[in-house]
Amino acid sequence: MWDPLLNEFPESVHGFRCMLAIKYLQSVEETYEPNTLGHDLIRDLISVVRARDYVEATRRYNHFHARLEGSPKAELRQPIQQPCCCPHCPRHKQATIMDVQAHVPKAQNIQNVSKP
């Protein structure tokens, strides 16, 4: 179990509450399989708590709440049928292809320029 006395404390009471909320949500997250809707929703809720400003937190919460209200409780522990593949989302791992070379610009032949 995580011991708050052995770790660095946030500077404010609000930060401390957020830290405890995140630790609690992480323990709840462990009860869901990684490819389930419930796991995805808990990750969204953690991102709400971690948001730096009010506007961003409100935007994330509204998105989370809409997804939660549109999901039946029976589906929370069921595997997600279509996994998210958004490129900007850090929690979704993109499949990597190791045999494809990185983009390397081709060399161009330049005419010999000499001074007159």
Swiss-Prot record:
The keyword Flavoprotein belongs to this UniProt entry's keyword annotation: no
Localization annotation: Host cytoplasm, Host perinuclear region
Protein name: Protein V2
RNA-binding is among the record's keywords: no
Phenotypic consequence of C86S: Complete loss of suppression of silencing and interaction with Solanum lycopersicum SGS3
Main location: host cell
A GO cellular component entry from the record: host cell perinuclear region of cytoplasm
Function: Through its interaction with host SGS3, acts as a suppressor of RNA-mediated gene silencing, also known as post-transcriptional gene silencing (PTGS), a mechanism of plant viral defense that limits the accumulation of viral RNAs.
Domain of life: Viruses
Keywords: Host cytoplasm, Host-virus interaction, Inhibition of host innate immune response by virus, Suppressor of RNA silencing, Viral immunoevasion
Outcome (variant: C84S): Complete loss of suppression of silencing and interaction with Solanum lycopersicum SGS3
Signal peptide: none
